[in-house]
Amino acid sequence: MTVLIHVLGSDIPHHNHTVLRFFNDTLAATSEHAREFMVAGEDNGFTESCPALSLRFYGSKKVLAQAVIAKAKANRRQRFFFHGQFNTSLWLALLSGGIKPAQFYWHIWGADLYEVSHGLKFRLFYPLRRIAQGRVGGVFATRGDLSYFARQHPGVRGELLYFPTRMDPSLNAMAKERQRAGKLTILVGNSGDRSNQHIAALRAVYQQFGDTVNVVVPMGYPANNQAYIDEVRQAGLALFSAENLQILSEKMEFDAYLALLRQCDLGYFIFARQQGIGTLCLLIQADIPCVLNRDNPFWQDMAEQHLPVLFTTDDLNEQVVREAQRQLASVDKSGITFFSPNYLQPWHNALRIAAGEAE
């Protein structure tokens, strides 16, 4: 039997760390198909912190792709599970036959599916990537992403799977300890990445609420982002008074981030694709409703779980927000499919499917 190999094909430290810790702590003990990893980037202590995993690190995306292709060609029974697929060379290998469809299983993360960049390089590559995506052996994704993908590639197998957000189920009832009243606090975006469209989001919040709310913008990740942070701060101060605007430019530890989220009354996410599920989960867990772009297909996942969804096109005010909070508080969080531990069983299924052990 050939053991499944997992591929983290791009150096995305935060997400890669989450995946590796999840596999080490939760999956590796029960499945031999959850232990082998090829990772783009430096070790950064992963080998030491994930002793249950066999990790190989590669200095660049290109070097990793060459190693994957070599393994694929050497043994056509070898299967790979790609966690997010932002590696151009691997898509091209799937197109050229270097990697066969039956060897290629892909967990969609979001930006690896949607065609939102306007750069010339991306616009030229997207059509090729789209063809390659239709050749994968199978995809794993959120309900909304599966729906989006199936419209383009109806013949490719798709299975429901959620990114393993770090969650403590014991916190599901914690939100009820806080009485919500007074000035609203609104979280804008889930990180400092430009895909959050912070400036457009700040303008949208201002248009809805004026300078009557506290606005919190977490921008501590990614690193080396000061110029963009300054740009967002300048735009924010043109709309909101200094006491109502909080731009967080330092990276936060998880517990501090959790505490920050629980001080908020509303999350505001303007991006037109699925991203930031981790932050959405933590907000929902705390009975904090989220405003989504109607083009973000994750609203389908939320509606399927009978969660209230607010849209950027809705007329929003404090009364609407408080009602959404009330509705969220009435939901039994233990039954939400994309919460821990409910997302675990689909991961076990995904491993068997990708390894060729399940129909």
UniProtKB/Swiss-Prot annotation:
Main localization, broad class: membrane
GO cellular component terms given for this protein: plasma membrane
Report the EC code(s) recorded for this entry.
2.4.1.325
Q: Which reaction does it catalyse?
A: beta-D-ManNAcA-(1->4)-alpha-D-GlcNAc-di-trans,octa-cis-undecaprenyl diphosphate + dTDP-4-acetamido-4,6-dideoxy-alpha-D-galactose = alpha-D-FucNAc4-(1->4)-beta-D-ManNAcA-(1->4)-D-GlcNAc-undecaprenyl diphosphate + dTDP + H(+)
Q: Under which pathway is this protein filed?
A: Bacterial outer membrane biogenesis; enterobacterial common antigen biosynthesis
Which keywords has UniProt assigned to this entry?
A: Cell inner membrane, Cell membrane, Glycosyltransferase, Membrane, Transferase
Give the enzyme's main class according to its UniProt record, as a single word: transferase
Q: Which Pfam families match?
A: Glyco_transf_56
Molecular function in Gene Ontology: 4-acetamido-4,6-dideoxy-D-galactose transferase activity; fucosyltransferase activity
Q: How does it sit in the membrane?
A: Peripheral membrane protein
- GO biological process per UniProt: enterobacterial common antigen biosynthetic process; fucosylation
Tell whether Mitochondrion is among the UniProt keywords. Answer: no
Q: Where located?
A: Cell inner membrane
- Among its keywords, does the record have Membrane? yes
Function as written in the Swiss-Prot or TrEMBL entry: Catalyzes the synthesis of Und-PP-GlcNAc-ManNAcA-Fuc4NAc (Lipid III), the third lipid-linked intermediate involved in ECA synthesis.
| Family of this protein | Belongs to the glycosyltransferase 56 family.
Q: What is this protein called?
A: TDP-N-acetylfucosamine:lipid II N-acetylfucosaminyltransferase
User: What would be the name of the gene that encodes this protein?
Assistant: wecF
